[in-house]
Amino acid sequence: MEEKERQEQSIRNAMEQFGRLIREDFKRIEAIKQAPGRKDFKELDHITVGILPGDGIGPYIMEQALRVARYLLKDEVASGKVEFRTIPGMTIEERAQKNESLPAEVLEACKACDVLVKGPFVTPRAGDPWPNMVSANSLLRRALQLYAAVRPVRIPEKGIDWTFFRENIEGEYIWGNKGIQVDDDLAVDFKVLTRPGAERICRAAFEFAKNNGKTNVTVVTKANIVKLVDGNFLKTAHALEKEYPGITVREELVDSMAAKITDQEFTKGMQVFLLPNLYGDIVTDVAAEYQGGLGTASSSNIGDQYALFEAIHGVGNFLVQHNRAQYADPCSLIRAMGEMIAHIGYADKKEQLVKALDICTRTERKVVITTDKDGATAEEFTDYLLDTL
């Protein structure tokens, strides 16, 4: 009898916790519905670009990425149209001292900018010397409502020009630290999808396809097993398909997509990819490895009022510990700068950068980064890139 009563009490506690989570998300849904429309950068007299250098190799590669951005936007910076503003307070040491993943004053400084470019942040893991804080990246995305993670993958010699749209807030991650430990034997985590959340990421993918001459969107789910959440995501994509003549939806399962992404016959003709949060996190990393590694890939986190651009690799502790931080590959963060430059209205300058990077990393390769002392430093590679530009 005592065991049964214990279980009943555990159920009541779990239901109470679950109820709180549901009530919070009803409020979040209403906030999404009431949110203002997308910011038009053409109407802004002044654009502030916030810079968050990050941890580990972050400050080293950010210095080089800023050199490239300042060169490409030299006229805009000189005229006062564009301002680069470094935001302090986000090193792991500073965050650990306050035991805050995202200090309030840092968030306010971020909100005072129009777009952000960030290096990698440490997210503490078990065994690290830091407090067990939640991901600062996730908190930034939610606070600024950066619902679309957009990751381009280009492999020109294979005819690959892909763009991935990953839902950036919901799914398994939104309640990632709010699971319920029902009792010693049972733990429950959650996967969340809201209709407004699904609609805005799906529309972002379709709008991109329409504006860039793309004819298909591949929706990647596990809807054959995860019937409600993944099923509703897929239904939302098909409903929007009717609004975009000339753009068709292709369905793929996430396990097949991850297994066959390097199979050119399987991916033939694919252009734009649309994925829920967790699947997008995994598949885009696989695609980045196919492109040449995480050091070559960038991510754009897009919302209606703010946008954040970043490298998708980690902090490079190994390089720092072996006094090789200056040999880190800056290409991922330089590409992120290019995406930022396009987002604020200078797509032609981004294309100039993409072409120069192709020359420097694929065709000419006069200066090569190996991340070891037998290769070029980040500064030497950036000198080469600027000469090419």
What is each model feature region?
Residues 11-85:
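N-terminal phosphate-binding or glycine-rich loops at protein starts, especially the Walker A/P-loop
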Residues 55-58, 114, 165, 205, ...:
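Buried hydrophobic positions in well-ordered alpha/beta secondary-structure cores of metabolic enzymes
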Residues 88-92, 229-273, 277-281:
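Active-site rim loops that border cofactor/substrate pockets in soluble metabolic enzymes
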Residues 50-66, 71-73, 182-256:
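Glycine-rich phosphate/diphosphate-binding loop of Rossmann-like nucleotide-binding domains
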Residues 18-21, 25-28, 32-33, 175-178, ...:
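Glycine-rich phosphate/pyrophosphate-binding loop and the adjoining helix
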Residues 20, 262-364:
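Glycine-rich phosphate/nucleotide-binding loop
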